[in-house]
Amino acid sequence: MLDRCDRVQVAVIDRHKAAEGYRRIFGAETAREDSSRHLGAKRLILALGESEIELCEPDGAGRVGDHLAKWGESLMTAGYSTVDVAALERRLDQLGVTTAREGEQLYFGPPHTPGVPFVISPSTYRPRVGRASFLYETTNTLVSDWRTAAAIYSGLFGLDPSRFSKIGSHRFAYEGTLTLFDPPNRLDRIELSQVTGPDSAMGRFTARRGDSLYMAYVEVHDWPGVHAALMDSKSRWTPRGKDAATERDGGWVHPKELGGLLLGVSRTTVAWEWSGRKHLVAAPR
């Protein structure tokens, strides 16, 4: 029932300051500003490619303030879209999942998910803004068995396990699967990464938080522009290869640059290399 990974919500101290990195690196632009009683927040919503980044600054007591008090500035909510939010709400209700509605958005999360809070929005067309194309992934880091998590998400969202693609990394010490929604047409998925090494970055993260929401991924159609912005501004990031100056495929932007969001970046099609369809990867321009 899920269509796309269309947004993330990030808990920040100052929404306008947090927006600076997205503008500088990706050419993101303000889509709108509003407030959320459900979150207890003022929101600055950025257009990032076809997707949106909700920068949530506390506005009195509420979920955003609680998140900041416990974890500091960081990724708070994984956002996906569906063509029929009401139908998904009915499905979740039948499964005994506690949900909350605010406007067009549907919220739910633990204990019904393996540590990830979700916000579901209606699928809609948006023009691309800036150097990014779209978000396509949020990462659920796990101490528990990734197979159990995959079964949970399949049940909640009606996903087809035959479309999933198994993953693993010695470099980052995890194993798991990508719950691809519509391959090979789109990359959208939830990544399930079960930690295999306690000394890895994911291992240290899950030691503090357990099963949890870790990061997001964006595809960019203008990697040279993103790369130049990263290098020229001396932003903190890690290249996918060995040399930042000559990196051609992407990397990871440090949370300090993006108001607490660890954001993976990949040039057009390169993510298919680890998504089960290497033949779809086009050479860099």
Residue ranges and their predicted role:
Residues 1-62:
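An N-terminus-focused feature that recognizes amino-terminal "leader" regions
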Residues 1-19, 73-80, 121-157, 162, ...:
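N-terminal beta-strand motif that seeds the catalytic metal site of vicinal oxygen chelate
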